[in-house]
């Protein structure tokens, strides 16, 4: 989506050529394969685990096969540990809530989305130690700053890999186990 924002005589912006990078949250079009799979699911399968009739059993098989493929992709030992959520925000909230407990330490960055920072602040209110790493004037995070923020009780580093705001790709240090 391209748009050049210039004020018109009403004081409002008339967009003519701006590059809008937040496609993850607002993209309308999906790949054709996704559209076909959704339509097929609506018309041919039921709710997984909710009955013994053919459409429900097929839904359960699809769910099982999908979990198995994802477990293989991510080298997960147990496919039943793969969880599906409505969106990334819900997934992050679940992970943050389940992983961090009083006394734990977490590292994040000043560049993170509101949907990451809010649950981290809530955890901080409940005894989790939070370190927020700063960015430079270009929105770049120095990997050494992340490494330096880590402590003995660091349980997680919660941050994006690539920013749709700055276009920066972050290559974090990989801590040893």
Describe each region flagged by the PLM.
Residues 2-177:
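Pyridoxal 5′-phosphate
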């Amino acid at each position: 989506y391209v748009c050049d924002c210039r004020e018109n005589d009403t004081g409002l912006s008339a967009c003519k050529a701006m590059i809008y990078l937040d496609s993850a949250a607002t993209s309308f079009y999906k790949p054709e394969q996704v559209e076909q799979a959704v339509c097929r699911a609506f018309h041919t399968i039921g709710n997984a685990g909710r009955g013994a009739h053919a459409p429900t059993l097929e839904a359960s098989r699809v769910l099982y096969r999908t979990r198995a493929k994802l477990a293989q992709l991510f080298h997960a030992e147990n496919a039943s540990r793969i969880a599906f959520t409505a969106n990334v925000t819900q997934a992050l909230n679940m992970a943050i809530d389940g992983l961090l407990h009083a006394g734990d330490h977490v590292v994040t960055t000043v560049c993170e989305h509101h949907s990451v920072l809010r649950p981290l602040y809530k955890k901080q209110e409940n005894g989790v130690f939070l370190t927020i790493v700063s960015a430079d004037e270009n929105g770049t995070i120095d990997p050494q700053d992340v490494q330096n923020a880590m402590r003995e009780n660091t349980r997680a580093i919660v941050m994006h890999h690539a920013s749709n705001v700055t276009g920066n790709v972050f290559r974090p240090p990989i801590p040893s186990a």
